[in-house]
């Protein structure tokens, strides 16, 4: 499994997990977050590996569809980049202005 896909699925899962069924959440968490194999998940839930595989593939598509419609993750990434640029600009241009730094920190806390 490639790392980029794993990271993306984990990120999408963080944003949209509450929209999934309990079984979808459990399978995705075990597979992506806990690095369980299909066989281990199948054994845990007493189902076939194929059933686990199908469920995970369906759930991946569902997560991608949610992102395509809602853009929560992509908007988060853009906001994070802008915030980093703002922070760098303030640090270079207004290094002694603690008030601006405080506001940036508050925004960062909201984003996390």
Swiss-Prot record:
PANTHER family listed in its UniProt record: UPF0122 PROTEIN CBO2450/CLC_2298, UPF0122 PROTEIN YLXM
Function description: Might take part in the signal recognition particle (SRP) pathway. This is inferred from the conservation of its genetic proximity to ftsY/ffh. May be a regulatory protein.
Family indicated by similarity: Belongs to the UPF0122 family.
Protein name from the UniProt record: UPF0122 protein EF_1701
Species this protein is from: Enterococcus faecalis (strain ATCC 700802 / V583)
InterPro entries attached to this UniProt entry: RNA_pol_sigma_r3/r4-like (IPR013324), UPF0122 (IPR007394), UPF0122_fam_protein (IPR054831), WH-like_DNA-bd_sf (IPR036388)
HAMAP family linked to this entry: UPF0122 (MF_00245)
């Amino acid at each position: 499994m490639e790392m980029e896909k794993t990271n993306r699925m984990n990120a999408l899962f963080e944003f949209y997990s509450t929209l999934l069924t309990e079984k979808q959440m459990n399978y995705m968490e075990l597979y992506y977050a806990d690095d369980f194999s299909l066989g281990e998940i199948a054994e845990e839930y007493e189902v076939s590996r194929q059933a686990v595989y199908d469920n995970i593939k369906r759930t991946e598509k569902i997560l991608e569809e949610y992102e395509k419609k809602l853009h929560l993750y992509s908007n988060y990434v853009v906001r994070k980049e802008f915030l980093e640029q703002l922070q760098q600009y303030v640090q270079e241009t207004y290094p002694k202005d603690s008030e601006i730094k405080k506001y940036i920190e508050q925004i960062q806390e909201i984003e996390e």
